[in-house]
């Protein structure tokens, strides 16, 4: 299995503990997407191959953060497997609309908002984002992954990651404006 590819003994133990703790949850999440037992098992295995590459970013003590990180990776591996299975990976993205010019990935707007808004309000908005934006946003801003690392996890280009981050921030800002929270 994938554990034999890990040379460092402590990393191997950490991976094994993560696998034993989260495999059932990851399987459940993958199965909901692919609706096939074997594909769900493959998605969990493939997820751990990707997790091993980012093992240094996982803190076993922070269970909620670790859980969300592992679930996001597994869900996206399962989605990629599902899309490949039904040959949708060559279709143009339905969300590929024109980006607003006034929002950029490096915009400090959200940093300012964290000071103005309660975290629970922002968390509620993020939770309701389309998963394609939410997952990239969380991996970047909560888990601290680089665009390159996120691109590798999702099997997309860094430019696609950048677009999704910009769109996520734009959607968050629009929702806050809609709620009248922004001046």
Where are these regions (language model features)?
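Arg/Lys-rich amphipathic alpha helix in sigma70-family domain 2
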Residues: 72-93
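Sigma70-family region 2
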Residues: 7, 48-63
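Internal acidic/polar
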Residues: 88-112, 146
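A short pre-motif secondary-structure segment
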Residues: 136-140
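N-terminal module of bacterial RNA polymerase sigma factors
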Residues: 1-25, 53-55, 110, 181-183
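DNA-recognition helix of helix-turn-helix
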Residues: 148, 152-178
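Amphipathic, Lys/Arg- and hydrophobic-enriched alpha-helical face
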Residues: 19-38, 53-57, 126, 178
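Structural recognition of an alpha-helix C-terminal capping motif at a helix-to-coil junction
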Residues: 28, 42-49, 64-76
């Amino acid at each position: 299995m994938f554990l034999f590819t890990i040379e460092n003994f402590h990393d191997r133990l950490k991976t094994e503990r993560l696998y034993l703790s989260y495999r059932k949850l990851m399987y459940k999440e993958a199965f909901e997407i692919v609706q096939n037992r074997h594909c769900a098992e493959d998605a969990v295995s493939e997820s751990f191959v990707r997790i091993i590459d980012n093992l240094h970013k996982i803190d076993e003590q922070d269970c909620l953060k670790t859980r969300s990180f592992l679930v996001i990776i597994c869900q996206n591996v399962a989605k990629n497997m599902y899309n490949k299975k039904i040959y949708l990976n060559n279709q143009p993205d339905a969300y590929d609309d024109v980006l607003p010019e006034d929002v950029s990935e490096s915009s400090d707007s959200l940093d300012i908002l964290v000071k103005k808004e309660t975290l629970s309000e922002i968390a509620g908005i993020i939770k309701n984002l389309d998963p394609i934006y939410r997952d990239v946003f969380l991996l970047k801003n909560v888990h601290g992954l680089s665009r390159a690392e996120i691109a590798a996890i999702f099997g997309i280009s860094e430019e696609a990651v950048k677009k999704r981050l910009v769109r996520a921030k734009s959607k968050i800002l629009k929702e806050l404006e809609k709620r009248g929270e922004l001046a």
